């Protein structure tokens, strides 16, 4: 009886002593028009006018600065309860190639990187990496939104060795 009471008290103290999780009140998907795309492996992906049209995007006079991309990659959620997953989609940086006129048209496109549905996990104990396939999906999903100012890939200088 004493052990059960002590265990119960310990659990209560442990779970109530941790910081309380704060969630967003609304998802980014709650407003605006969204267009869903998927990728099957890690890599840099190109989204052109043709793909945007097939998704239903109105591409006439499409301001390239207003294109936004959201997604969290395609890896499985962590198994450990102590690792807190994201509660909403995050905006991903994209590279716009629009000829410098600020309008996405003709052969213009944007690029983004995706980890895909699989991941490599560092195992520091055994000094190696292990491959983890997403058991629940063969695709990673991303959402395109038109409106506002999107996050862009920035150039960085590389230092010499």
Describe each region flagged by the PLM.
Residues 43-58:
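Short amphipathic, basic-aromatic surface patches that mediate peripheral association
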Residues 20-39, 55-161:
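Structured catalytic cores of large enzymes
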Residues 1-22:
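Bacterial Sec-dependent N-terminal signal peptides
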């Amino acid at each position: 009886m004493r052990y059960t009471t002590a265990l119960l008290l310990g659990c209560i103290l442990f779970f109530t002593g941790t910081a309380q999780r704060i969630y967003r009140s609304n998802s980014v998907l709650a407003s605006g028009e969204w267009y869903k795309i998927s990728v099957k492996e890690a890599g840099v992906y190109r989204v052109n006018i043709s793909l945007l049209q097939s998704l239903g995007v109105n591409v006439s006079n499409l301001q390239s600065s207003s294109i936004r991309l959201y997604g969290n990659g395609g890896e499985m959620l962590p198994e450990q309860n102590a690792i807190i997953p994201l509660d909403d989609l995050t905006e991903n940086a994209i590279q716009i190639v629009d000829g410098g006129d600020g309008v996405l048209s003709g052969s213009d496109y944007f690029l983004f990187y995706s980890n895909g549905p699989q991941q490599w996990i560092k195992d520091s104990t055994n000094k190696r990496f292990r491959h983890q396939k997403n058991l629940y999906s063969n695709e990673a999903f991303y959402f395109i939104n038109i409106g506002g100012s999107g996050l862009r890939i920035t150039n960085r200088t590389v230092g010499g060795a």
